[in-house]
Amino acid sequence: MRHQLNTKLACKEIKILVRSIDETKQMKVVLVAPEIPHNTGAIGRTCVALDLELILINPLGFDIDDANVARAGTRYWKYVNLSRYENWLDFIKSRKPKRKDMFFFEENGQNSFYKADYSKESYLVFGCESKGLPHEILE
């Protein structure tokens, strides 16, 4: 069973999650086909602050060298631990993540991300801003 988590949560839960990440460094944030450079830059900045790897899955809706990405990530973008894959299948073949380590964030997920059982090997997977995650990834 894949973890589909609800992203509509109170700030209190988000703060608790961030505090708990101290114990689980090296988690990975996966953005599947991100569309908005500012969002990716801001997520990259957060990854630097929390010592998380950022993984981008093509297609991207912008050039990764876009000034907007760097601007949103400000001076931190050069410190992002960044990996990129041509598509979801390449990512799966290369990383070989365990099913239990994959956490899929959806607007209408059934579970609170605060209650998930994260580990150092966890992959936090987010879809593109306008469409979310493709069904083939969630199946």
What does each model-found stretch correspond to?
Residues M1-E139:
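Post-transcriptional modification and biogenesis factors for structured RNAs
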